[in-house]
């Protein structure tokens, strides 16, 4: 699963990766569209789709935490 990720910082940060991935998986489960899942994960979760998924999952107030975690995964 981790081999094909776009995020260089996945190894050693699997718990963080799991938290961020969960948003995309939940978003996919709501919309049932593989383009949503791919778009959410695009660019190591730095896509506009990820932000839209946070909004759809009613987790916008957690955006600062997710922004920090995505920064860790992109390190």
UniProtKB/Swiss-Prot annotation:
One of its GO terms (biological process) is neuropeptide signaling pathway. SUPFAM superfamilies: Crustacean CHH/MIH/GIH neurohormone (SSF81778). GO terms for cellular component: extracellular region. The modification Alanine amide is found at residue 75. PANTHER family: ION TRANSPORT PEPTIDE, ISOFORM C. Belongs to the arthropod CHH/MIH/GIH/VIH hormone family. This is Molt-inhibiting hormone. The lineage of its organism: Eukaryota, Metazoa, Ecdysozoa, Arthropoda, Crustacea.
């Amino acid at each position: 699963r981790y081999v094909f990720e776009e995020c260089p910082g996945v190894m050693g940060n699997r718990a963080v990766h799991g938290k961020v991935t969960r948003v995309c998986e939940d978003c996919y489960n709501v919309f049932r569209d593989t383009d949503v899942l791919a778009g959410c994960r695009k660019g190591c979760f730095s896509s506009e789709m990820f932000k839209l998924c946070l909004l759809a999952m009613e987790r916008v107030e957690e955006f600062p935490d997710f922004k920090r975690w995505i920064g860790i995964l992109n390190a």
